[in-house]
Amino acid sequence: MRPPPGSASAALGALLCAGAVALAAYASHVAEAAQAARFGMAAAFAFAHGIALIVLAPRRSSLAALVRVLVVLGVAGFSGGLCLAAWRGTGAPTAPIGGSLLIVAWLLAALDLWRRGDRR
């Protein structure tokens, strides 16, 4: 029996949310003040986009599949870049790329939702 379409995306979204909660706890209880803001921002973006992956998982269009891939890559670039920057104490060179991917993902999601309405 095959898993339903999008179940991997939904599972990844749930894992992103779990990681985001752990990261927020780290930011709140362990990180130094200078790091906490970056870790907190990374956690907020990872959590929000984890929920988005769960919500978008049932959509079956090829555009929705592209959106899910862009969300994963965008979160990796944005949140991952912020975390790396916080740990290293440097800039976050991948954050703008990740953020741009997230913007494109949301614009494509809007297009997919507009074209298909509430149909899945």
Describe the residue ranges of each PLM region.
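Transmembrane helix-loop-helix
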Residues: P5-S9, R59-L101, L107-G117
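N-terminal signal-anchor transmembrane alpha helix
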Residues: S7-H29
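Interfacial loop at the N-terminal end of multi-pass membrane proteins
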Residues: R2-P3, Y26-A43
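Core segments of alpha-helical transmembrane spans in multipass integral membrane proteins
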Residues: L15-L23, A37-S62, V69-A76
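Alpha-helical transmembrane segments of polytopic membrane proteins
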Residues: G40-A46, P96-I103
